[in-house]
């Protein structure tokens, strides 16, 4: 500024200024010829053309090598899917444009596949907040800022990114689309697409069929030479549009290196400026292309061995009966014998299956208590006077009705030493439990003289017991 003022005072001519409307401000015929020589003939032809046209070196050595390697036949590139978005009208014949740098497109912005929030209200004054990496005092890191804003979105997430290899951010986008049902648009650079597809495959995310996620490819501007050679640029725009209300834009790429190693900055914008980013995203969406077809699934290989095909995976179901072999040619008797159905082998009977199941079944509960037989009762009667502990056992045995007693009552022999009579009615019923004092176990001395005599000695003569009843059985008659 001071130098120009000093030159104006001294009257020194600083040279003619190129106006912005002049073609020479953005276009150079010498640079175009040099670039055509680079794409068609190589780096040596490019240097020769630069010297012949007396141009300043406008390409570095790395740019020269990159452009020469990226050059391709534009007739092959033209066969790729059209970059027009869904809803836009196209024609087979490219009519071109009447102006070299058209200011506006004749076609309206296309309708996006997952919808787009429309809010015509004024969003307020534009406000900006700067975040850096490494973070400043009291500020979150750039990756944390982006993740928090994505997790807080509830209407829309639209991402334009050059390199996308961060798994955490991809999982956040998938979670927003599938769980919170937030439309997610993702526009990626064409040259960096293989890295993103590899990341999605490792995470088990299908970018072609993930619900509520639209992934498309964007390429930079193209230069086409007269020798059918073409070179395309990359996408350097990086911003995230959230709910149509907030925008995160800056130098941060969705990579681990940008989150941990590289220095960068982003700006969180709100207000009226968001409408400009919304228009830019829809413009890029209109120029984008769908993803290339998904590669066929390869059989998985574990430890150098190819895993066989699972028999439980059914690729196609057909309701077709199995074809029977054709009948052999010959006499009618042979053909009838071939068509005769052979008798089926008889299977096991139901009773055999039930017995096998019962044998194989293991008891899950406590073992069943064995029943008392008549032999057990006679054995207990022999041990009646042994000890006090045995008396308790005798009482427990005498106070319970066992299957042996029930069998003896049914046969008329009685379940006790006195020959109990079956007191059930003729039509049947439950067996009553006998009183405990009526069940007596005889000691060896009592068995020697007889049970009845011993019982009579214990009671006064001529006195009839109050609970005496006619008994039938061994040694007792009514």
Swiss-Prot record:
Membrane-crossing segments per the record: none
Compositional bias ranges of the Polar residues kind: 379-388
Result after altering residue 277 to A: Decreased interaction with CSNK1A1 and CSNK1E
GO biological process, one term: signal transduction
Annotated segments matching region Disordered: 292-334, 359-436, 452-478
Keyword set, alphabetical order: Cytoplasm
GO molecular function, one term: protein kinase binding
Subcellular location: Cytoplasm; Cytoplasm, Perinuclear region
Composition skew (Basic residues), residue ranges: 309-319
Gene3D superfamilies noted in UniProt: Endonuclease Chain A
InterPro entries with a match to the protein in the record: FAM83, SACK1
Region annotated DUF1669, chain positions: 1-293
Entry remark concerning the domains of this protein: All members of the FAM83 family of proteins share a conserved N-terminal DUF1669 (domain of unknown function 1669) domain of about 300 amino acids. This domain mediates the interaction with casein kinase 1 (CK1) isoforms. Therefore, it has been proposed to rename DUF1669 the polypeptide anchor of CK1 domain.
Family in the record: Belongs to the FAM83 family.
Cited function: May play a role in MAPK signaling.
PANTHER family according to UniProt: PROTEIN FAM83A-RELATED
Oligomeric form and interacting partners: Directly interacts (via DUF1669) with CSNK1A1, CSNK1A1L, CSNK1D and CSNK1E. May interact with RAF1.
Name of this protein: Protein FAM83E
Protein species of origin: Homo sapiens
